């Protein structure tokens, strides 16, 4: 059996996006499922659009997710270089070789001419295509242009009567007629290869066997098959085009939509666990056989199958991601949870100094992502307790609140062990004496300790206070009720 070799080939023109991440994950899982090799190649020839941290963003964030390349610019193998910018001479030579074989030609058309043709096609309700002005240019005219050092691109001659077909790994048989294509540029005027030309040469040189990528590349595949044919490359990878990822409105995720979190760095900053995010992204377009929702990396590799990859749009459901992440958070040990959550903890409770760990643990079973801890603390604790105001509120609601609290303080004072279970039992026993239960029992106590009517388990909150502080707080409240 041939060794499966897949690749992920991003351009460092931006930061790692969920769409590119899903592509990388699927290629990684396919390779590893068959004990193959996963390669990361950087398509960095668009120097004007490349950003400084573009390459690091790709590698650092994929590594954070557990997606590690067998070969890359940082871990080169025998199929380099892994930066397209280091291979420009190879592309250029092959482009000129195609001219010699009459399979490509120099195009001297100006940008203005091409733009004029494009606008005219649009005005005539036609798909803009290159009209072949230079395809059959006489050799004397070519020589004249070259003597004047006129700039030119190199275009591939597309056979309009041909058909370009492949059995798509995701979508089945796809056929695109040559008449739907145009003579594409394979080498730009600055001598740099275009995407479609360079990617064919790279995939061939690196012996890539399978290519999974976004649906937007379907038309590119037809062009690339034409390039494979022109170059005489017999070993052609299998192509699969993944589903479109859509937002809640059904529109394709757009990197320009700043309202939607969709870059991996953003998810890191907001406190999503890498295992949870990997799990979620792997389910975007891949449907496990047994409707299982939770997979670690090993399980993903074992279960991944192209037969379960679908072409229907994949809904990027942030609520599902939060649900998955919450489940992963719950599975953390208390120590691991606090080490995780402490990275995001900004809000402090001024009357519970040095209790950050205990306070954070109150929310372990309800938090969906790291930064949410601050919102939950703000909702559950006041920064300063206004005893008189709270006493007045409770006094109006519960006329016998003072007697109840006096007995509660006395009973709590008698506890030998200051634990949530014992505290809860004591509250219920005292409440029963005064025929208090539910809201009437717990809300006044919660107001005392948090200044809020709702929040985490009350007994665990009280446990965070040492016994003396808790009882003193209740007594302050009792004294305040004397005002009413």
Curated annotation (Swiss-Prot):
One GO biological process this protein is involved in is: glutamyl-tRNA aminoacylation
| Positions bound to ATP | 255
Its Gene Ontology cellular component terms are: cytosol
Q: Which CDD domains match?
A: GluRS_core
The protein's Enzyme Commission number: 6.1.1.17
Q: What is its main location?
A: cytoplasm
Record keywords, A-Z: Aminoacyl-tRNA synthetase, ATP-binding, Cytoplasm, Ligase, Nucleotide-binding, Protein biosynthesis
Record motif 'KMSKS' region, residues: 252-256
* Pfam families documented for this protein: Anticodon_2, tRNA-synt_1c
Catalyses which reaction? tRNA(Glu) + L-glutamate + ATP = L-glutamyl-tRNA(Glu) + AMP + diphosphate
The molecular function terms of the Gene Ontology recorded here are: ATP binding; glutamate-tRNA ligase activity; tRNA binding; zinc ion binding
Subcellular location(s): the record lists: Cytoplasm
Q: Which family does it belong to?
A: Belongs to the class-I aminoacyl-tRNA synthetase family. Glutamate--tRNA ligase type 1 subfamily.
The UniProt subunit note reads as follows:
Monomer.
State its role: Catalyzes the attachment of glutamate to tRNA(Glu) in a two-step reaction: glutamate is first activated by ATP to form Glu-AMP and then transferred to the acceptor end of tRNA(Glu).
Which HAMAP family does UniProt cross-reference here?
A: Glu_tRNA_synth_type1
PANTHER family linked: GLUTAMATE--TRNA LIGASE, GLUTAMATE--TRNA LIGASE, MITOCHONDRIAL-RELATED
Entry protein name: Glutamate--tRNA ligase
Annotated source species: Mycoplasma genitalium (strain ATCC 33530 / DSM 19775 / NCTC 10195 / G37) (Mycoplasmoides genitalium)
């Amino acid at each position: 059996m041939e060794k499966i070799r897949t690749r992920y080939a991003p351009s460092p023109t931006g930061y790692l996006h969920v769409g590119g991440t899903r592509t990388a994950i699927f290629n990684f899982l396919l390779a590893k499922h068959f004990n193959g090799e996963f390669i990361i190649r950087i398509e960095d020839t668009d120097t004007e659009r490349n950003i400084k941290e573009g390459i690091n963003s790709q590698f650092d964030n994929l590594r954070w997710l557990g997606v590690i390349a067998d070969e890359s610019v940082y871990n080169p193998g025998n199929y380099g270089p892994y930066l397209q910018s280091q291979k420009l001479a190879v592309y250029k030579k092959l482009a000129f070789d195609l001219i010699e074989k009459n399979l490509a030609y120099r195009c001297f058309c100006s940008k203005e001419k091409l733009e004029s043709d494009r606008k005219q096609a649009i005005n005539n309700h036609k798909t803009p295509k290159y009209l072949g002005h230079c395809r059959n240019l006489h050799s004397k005219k070519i020589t004249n242009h070259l003597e004047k050092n006129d700039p030119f691109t190199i275009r591939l001659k597309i056979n309009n009567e041909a058909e370009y077909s492949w059995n798509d790994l995701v979508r089945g048989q796809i056929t695109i007629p040559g008449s739907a294509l145009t003579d594409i540029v394979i080498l730009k005027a600055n001598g740099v290869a275009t995407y479609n030309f360079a990617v064919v040469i790279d995939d061939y040189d690196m012996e890539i066997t399978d290519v999974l990528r976004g649906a937007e590349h379907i038309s590119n595949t037809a062009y690339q098959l034409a390039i494979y044919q022109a170059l005489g490359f017999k070993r052609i990878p299998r192509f699969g085009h993944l589903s479109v990822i859509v937002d809640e409105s059904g529109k394709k995720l757009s990197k320009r939509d700043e309202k939607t979190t969709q870059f991996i760095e953003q998810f890191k900053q907001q406190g999503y666990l890498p295992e949870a995010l990997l799990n979620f992204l792997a389910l975007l377009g891949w449907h496990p056989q047994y409707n299982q929702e939770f997979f670690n990396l090993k399980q993903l590799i074992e279960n991944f199958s192209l037969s379960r990859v679908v072409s229907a749009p994949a809904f990027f459901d942030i609520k599902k991601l939060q649900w998955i992440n919450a489940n992963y958070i719950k599975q953390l040990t208390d120590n691991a949870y606090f080490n995780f959550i402490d990275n995001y903890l900004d809000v402090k409770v001024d009357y519970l100094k040095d209790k950050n760990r205990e306070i954070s643990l109150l929310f372990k079973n309800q938090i969906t992502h790291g930064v949410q801890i601050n919102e939950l603390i703000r909702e559950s604790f006041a920064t300063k307790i206004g005893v008189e105001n709270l006493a007045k509120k409770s006094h109006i609601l519960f006329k016998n609140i003072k007697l109840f609290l006096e007995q509660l303080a006395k009973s709590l004072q008698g506890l030998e062990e200051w634990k949530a279970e014992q505290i809860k039992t004591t509250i219920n026993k005292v409440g029963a004496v005064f025929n208090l239960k539910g809201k009437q029992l717990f809300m006044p106590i919660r107001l005392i300790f948090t200044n809020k009517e709702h929040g985490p388990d009350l007994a665990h909150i009280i446990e965070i206070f040492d016994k003396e502080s808790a009882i003193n707080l209740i007594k302050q409240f009792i004294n305040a009720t004397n005002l009413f």
